[in-house]
Amino acid sequence: MTEFDLSTREGRWKHFGSVDPIEGTKPTIKEEMKDLQSTHKNFLFEIEEVGIKNLVYPVLVDRFQTAGNFSFSTSLNLDEKGINMSRILESVEKHYHNGIELDFDALYQLLRSLQERMNQNAAGLDVSAKWFFDRFSPITQIKAVGHADVTYGLAIDKQNVTRKEITIEAAVTTLCPCSKEISEYSAHNQRGIVTVKAYINKDIELIDNYKDVILDAMEANASSILYPILKRPDEKSVTERAYENPRFVEDLIRLIAADLVDFDWLDGFDIECRNEESIHQHDAFAKLKYRK
């Protein structure tokens, strides 16, 4: 058995099974290597989307830096074997300035760079991140950081935007109207998870505070908002407000829809509420879709 010098890293590696590299015969210089992706011939079908998923990169959502989870794709012509996926990361890095800014204008410019770098007509992305914001307790007005989940979706074909959407998911309190109605006192309540996918009108200038407007529709129509910090006066207020505003999942999504339906910057929306029922072993949910 070969003895290795265990006082060195290389010796320990070989002791645990590492071996020396072989003398290879294939090129090691990029220009001499075969580029399979760039092969051109009839590959039978065009591909609508090909790319990468689960790319985690720093992003800026308003004034907070957080982690974004990206998927990127481009189209692929019938006569091309594949895309050069490393160029996707090169395009991302070109737009990285202490975090990729999550707004539609910045993401559009990123897609245009990707489109040009990949030499393809169509490109798209989806990116999810935590959205942090200041939240004040209802009575004592103590500030803390609240959060919701946001997902931006954007796609282009040449210079034209073909898909523009934002999804916001936030937790709220819902108090059961039936429980309140049949009980002598109190009512069961629970955390509800509300998701709104908003389809943005591509032909109208988008208002600056669109995220806040959508989140307000989601939270204000619930039995109560969730707060990071509650002192006793706040807790009293939250408890009583929930009792005064009972909501089924059906009620909540209809009320949210009523708030959103007349905005000209929206082409439509999907709304879902899922209640983590406090007196059942199952969840309750409701969904609706609306298109103009």
UniProtKB/Swiss-Prot annotation:
Q: Does the keyword 4Fe-4S apply?
A: no
Molecular-function annotations in GO: GTP cyclohydrolase I activity
Top-rank taxon of the source lineage equals: Bacteria
User: What organism does this protein naturally occur in?
Assistant: Staphylococcus saprophyticus subsp. saprophyticus (strain ATCC 15305 / DSM 20229 / NCIMB 8711 / NCTC 7292 / S-41)
Protein family per UniProt: Belongs to the GTP cyclohydrolase IV family.
Job description of the protein: Converts GTP to 7,8-dihydroneopterin triphosphate.
Q: What is its EC number?
A: 3.5.4.16
Q: What class of enzyme is it?
A: hydrolase
**Which keywords does the record carry?**
Hydrolase
This chain's protein is named: GTP cyclohydrolase FolE2
Pfam families, from UniProt?
GCHY-1
Reaction(s) catalyzed by this protein?
GTP + H2O = 7,8-dihydroneopterin 3'-triphosphate + formate + H(+)
| Site, as annotated: May be catalytically important | 176
* Biological pathway: Cofactor biosynthesis; 7,8-dihydroneopterin triphosphate biosynthesis; 7,8-dihydroneopterin triphosphate from GTP: step 1/1
Q: Which GO terms describe its biological process?
A: tetrahydrofolate biosynthetic process
